[in-house]
Amino acid sequence: MNTEEMLEEVFRRAKAYELRGGNCAQCSLSAIFEVLGVEDDNVVRAATGFADGVGLSGDGHCGALSGSTMAISYFFGRKKEDLARLGKQLRALLLAKELHKQFVEEFSTCRCYDIQVKKYGRFFNLYNMEDMKAAVEAGMPEGCSTLVGQTARMALKIILDEQAKKDKKTELPVV
């Protein structure tokens, strides 16, 4: 797949996963991993609690942003053996900051609660069956699944662009 096909595929997969079973963090992360050929269910499992602003609270940032940031960190983050080396995390932090910037430019905020209020006029408590029904009626599955796809696409583009820079630096000069 070329870059554009990969970006479309990650959008399609992330959106489809979100529509099928939800959990914005896991859906964005899973789609990115699949398009890049990564199989790591432990990392996907670790994303579970980030859904809907952490624990369905709405009071944290969007789970799609969390899952996509986890994907960036998976490829560019520092390892446990480097925890004492502050500089080892800089690359992942700068890339995560770029994703956050793009996300806020696109959606005006990164807080799940605020995104829901902006898109649907209110926040939905997804632990409450009446709110769950109201969310479906308001179009939340379609709206959030599109957001999840867009966020996964943003993150994948950042990953691919950063990898291309790294590959260019390691190319041997033509003699």
Please tell me what each predicted stretch does.
Residues 50-59:
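Transmembrane alpha-helix interface/packing and boundary motifs in multi-pass membrane proteins
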Residues 30-34, 69-72, 86-163, 167-175:
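Amphipathic alpha-helical interface segments
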Residues 1-20:
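Polybasic, low-complexity association/targeting segments
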Residues 63, 67-76:
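Catalytic phosphate/nucleotide-handling subdomain of diverse soluble enzymes
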Residues 1-5, 32-49, 122-129:
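Acidic-glycine-rich active-site phosphate/pyrophosphate-binding loop
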Residues 24, 62, 112:
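Short cysteine clusters
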Residues 14, 28, 46-51, 151:
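Short alpha-helical scaffolding segments that buttress acidic/His motifs in well-ordered protein cores
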